[in-house]
From Swiss-Prot:
UniProtKB keywords: Biological rhythms, Cell adhesion, Cell membrane, Disulfide bond, Glycoprotein, Membrane, Secreted, Signal, Synapse, Transmembrane, Transmembrane helix
Name the record gives this protein: Neuroligin-1
Region annotation (Disordered) ranges: 647-688, 822-843
A single GO BP: postsynaptic specialization assembly
Membrane-related topology note: Single-pass type I membrane protein
Organism ancestry: Eukaryota, Metazoa, Chordata, Craniata, Vertebrata
Species, as recorded: Rattus norvegicus
Biased composition (Basic residues): 831-843
């Protein structure tokens, strides 16, 4: 598959642009141009042979394998499996950023999958509520994919379509009615193909790119599909909250994979200027986080504003979900260290000890996070993720990317399935307990919990059919779906579209027929994945044992067309029109639907199902309950009950003790029935015959709250406006403790759970440099606090990450982060961190 001559000017221009970008290295312009042009000639002269597919990359030659697909409308693909994109992160490189792979001299066979990153898939310890239904229902199949584990796991898989364009054109001219000759064929004259990099989900703890076969999507959409392995769990996201272990190694793996892709995908016929990242669940939140990181900037084929990728698709996951970021990483690092017998009093010794432990010993430890949260995941380190994702979005850090995102109709299925007798509906007592448990685990403001609990019950009760257990089950499913997925996705779409950046929103309303899910289930978390990958076109698989119908095949073709169109142009409607007559003669209703761009005003979204339509304001009432009313209820409660609770700031000569007798235990566990006994919390839903004073009180309270909020809004208009403007330039954060006190002190001493909305700005200004702050001097916006559990108040801030542990006097900076030499990968962390001034309005 040789690149056409018409692409010469395009690649020459890219080579020249690359020279301009790399001119800063000091090399003479003549030599730079000569080297880049020689490399361009090498790329153009390569030919991908279908019989013996051999590609020469920057690191050596690799041989792939040709695979035929079980569908006559799908051409074969060439698979390159187990391609290394980074060096093994083993030994002293554990808990360090990735380095480039070592070159190889012989031909490397890329015909089978590489080992997966270490993980422990044990039924009963998995966060089932955050995993796809097909994942948890087929653990035996998933386990077969993750048997071969190794820390040497940083590999990717490449799926390249190989259909001969000329042969297709001739056959379509001779037989226009042939199935392969569909209207607006997706072949585009053999030019460089768009690239789609899939990031797998799994709550940052489980999964592998090997699970997801990109062959059908690549063949049908005429795009190159890449799946990636990245470090998971403790090995990918352990953080001590300081320089000893900054965390986010899994995200840095993904960035390295994207850098490898941008520098090598041209050898496979791919376009380095049309790279789209997409993922589902935790993979979707990774996609969102990558759009917010300055490490995603920089592409050798263009100027730095183009980035390592240009478009992003976040399926059922954004950076604003409660489980997207770990706000208490140091606590879980100490819990793990205690379990394996490492010293927790010094973070440097802790990390050195963990580096020497067998990886299996670390992975096998059961470190349970607070419910609806994660123990080991991305952290706000002040570098890879410079600030809270919501703040970064408000500042426009992701405005340069085209973004498509959406949710499934019934994401929260697993939350409801875990309730007793959910198949027969949900009883009033179970409903009450589920809501109470939900509030207790997500909101750390005890003064207002009763009002919040009753407000949620009131809003999620269908008063026209409130005695029906099945109706109660439906509303409870909506509660979990709205809070954990819908509201964060809508908030993300609003923030992105506010900058005029192309934004597309969808709601997925279809799932395949299978006996593994209850009949009452809607499209659950992860149910869109088989349709994106084109599984219905090749029939059931072990992982997706569905009874696929022609409607499933049609819908999969529709979804793949939208996704690949977006990867090609940033517009899901172009260039390929929706036409599935090659499947059956039944009209495709998507042909008459134009997916309109999303804006905060209209909030238009595409309903993806058998009856597609463009609608507006998806679940607006419930979304605004979570984004507007609930944060203001907290604010109102704090204003009405506020008393000064500011902790006295001790002088620096006071040494914090590792523990106190009255300190709260650092371990967290799921709430028990004893803790949240519904009998101790009378509910209006527990019995049928009762007075309705509670509901009336809640109604009056909500109404009074809204009235009072309107009054407050006028009174505080200018104050909030000025505060918002100043917060963009100056956000208060905790002062650093001396030496290693961050890890010595319990979390409750470092950050107060009672973050009051008061005039603490004045307190910030009055704090002297020599003072040690034991609590958040300037509390974050309440909308940010909504994602944090009672024991997950954030330790990480942009300032705390720059700390260098120095419990030993005169110690030198430890665990220097590896840098990439030779001009490659030179934007990953450097040994001596210094404050990074990231642009808030990249253009």
């Amino acid at each position: 598959m040789a690149l056409p001559r018409c692409m010469w000017p395009n690649y020459v221009w890219r080579a020249m642009m690359a020279c301009v970008v790399h001119r800063g290295s000091g090399a003479p312009l003549t030599l730079c141009l000569l080297g880049c042009l020689l490399q361009t000639f090498h790329v153009l002269s390569q030919k991908l042979d279908d019989v013996d597919p051999l590609v020469t990359t920057n690191f050596g030659k690799i041989r792939g394998i040709k695979k035929e697909l079980n569908n006559e409308i799908l051409g074969p693909v060439i698979q390159f499996l187990g391609v290394p994109y980074a060096a093994p992160p083993t030994g002293e490189h554990r808990f360090q950023p990735p380095e480039p792979p070592s070159p190889w001299s012989d031909i490397r066979n890329a015909t089978q999958f590489a080992p997966v990153c270490p993980q422990n898939i044990i039924d009963g310890r998995l966060p089932e509520v955050m995993l796809p239904v097909w994942f948890t229902n087929n653990l035996d199949v998933v386990s077969s994919y993750v048997q071969d584990q190794s820390e040497d796991c940083l590999y990717l898989n490449i799926y390249v379509p190989t259909e001969d364009v000329k042969r297709i054109s001739k056959e379509c001219a001779r037989k226009p009615g042939k199935k392969i000759c569909r209207k607006g064929d997706i072949r585009d004259s053999g030019g460089p193909k768009p690239v789609m990099v899939y990031i797998h989900g799994g709550s940052y703890m489980e999964g592998t790119g090997n699970l997801y076969d990109g062959s059908v999507l690549a063949s049908y959409g005429n795009v190159i599909v890449i799946t990636v392995n990245y470090r998971l769990g403790v090995l990918g996201f352990l953080s001590t909250g300081d320089q000893a272990a900054k965390g986010n190694y899994g995200l840095l793996d993904l960035i390295q994979a994207l850098r490898w892709t941008s520098e090598n995908i041209g050898f496979f016929g791919g376009d380095p200027l049309r790279i789209t990242v997409f993922g589902s669940g935790a993979g979707g939140s990774c996609v969102n986080l990558l759009t917010l990181s300055h490490y995603s900037e920089g592409n050798r084929w263009s100027n730095s504003t183009k980035g390592l990728f240009q478009r992003a698709i976040a399926q059922s996951g954004t950076a604003l979900s409660s489980w997207a970021v770990s706000f208490q990483p140091a606590k879980y690092a100490r819990i793990l260290a205690t379990k394996v017998g490492c010293n927790v009093s010094d973070t440097v010794e802790l990390v050195e000890c963990l580096q020497k432990k067998p990886y299996k010993e670390l992975v096998d430890q059961d470190v349970q996070p607070a419910r609806y949260h994660i123990a080991f995941g991305p952290v706000i380190d002040g570098d890879v993720i410079p600030d809270d994702p919501q703040i970064l979005m408000e500042q426009g850090e992701f405005l340069n990317y085209d973004i498509m995102l959406g949710v499934n109709q019934g994401e929260g299925l697993k939350f409801v399935e875990n309730i007793v007798d959910s198949d027969d509906g949900v009883s009033a007592s179970d409903f009450d307990f589920a809501v109470s448990n939900f509030v207790d685990n997500l909101y750390g403001y005890p003064e207002g919990k009763d009002v919040l609990r009753e407000t949620i019950k009131f809003m999620y009760t269908d008063w026209a059919d409130r005695h029906n257990p099945e109706t109660r089950r439906k509303t409870l499913l909506a509660l979990f779906t709205d809070h954990q997925w819908v509201a964060p996705a809508v908030a993300t779409a609003d923030l992105h579209s506010n900058f005029g950046s192309p934004t597309y929103f969808y709601a997925f309303y279809h799932h395949c027929q299978t006996d593994q899910v209850p009949a009452w289930a809607d499209a659950a978390h992860g149910d869109e994945v088989p349709y994106v990958l084109g599984i219905p076109m090749i029939g059931p698989t072990e992982l997706f044992p569905c009874n696929f119908s022609k409607n499933d095949v049609m819908l999969s073709a529709v979804v793949m067309t939208y996704w690949t169109n977006f990867a090609k142009t940033g517009d899901p409607n172009q260039p390929v029109p929706q036409d599935t007559k090659f499947i059956h003669t039944k009209p495709n209703r998507f042909e008459e639907v134009a997916w309109t761009r999303y804006s905060q005003k209209d909030q238009l979204y595409l309903h993806i199902g058998l009856k597609p339509r463009v609608k507006e304001h998806y679940r607006a009432n419930k979304v605004n309950l979570w984004l507007e009313l609930v944060p203001h209820l907290h604010n109102l409660n704090d204003i009405s009950q506020y008393t000064s609770t500011t902790t006295k700031v001790p002088s620096t000569d006071i040494t914090l003790r590792p523990t106190r007798k009255n300190s709260t235990p650092v371990t967290s566990a799921f709430p028990t029935a004893k803790q949240d006994d519904p009998k101790q919390q009378p509910s209006p839903f527990s019995v049928d015959q009762r007075d309705y004073s509670t509901e009336l009180s809640v109604t009056i309270a909500v109404g009074a709250s809204l009235l009072f909020l309107n009054i407050l809004a006028f009174a505080a208009l200018y104050y909030k406006k000025d505060k918002r403007r100043h917060d963009v330039h100056r956000r208060c954060s905790p002062q650093r403790t001396t030496t290693n006190d961050l890890t010595h002190a319990p979390e409750e001493e470092i950050m107060s759970l009672q973050m009051k909305h008061t005039d603490l700005d004045h307190e910030c200004e009055s704090i002297h440099p020599h003072e040690v702050v034991l609590r958040t001097a300037c509390p974050p916006d309440y909308t940010l606090a909504m994602r944090r559990s009672p024991d997950d108040v954030p330790l990480m801030t942009p300032n705390t990450i720059t700390m260098i542990p120095n419990t030993i006097p005169g110690i030198q900076p430890l665990h220097t982060f590896n840098t990439f030499t030779g001009g490659q990968n030179n934007t990953l962390p450097h040994p001596h961190p210094h404050p990074h001034s990231h642009s808030t309005t990249r253009v």
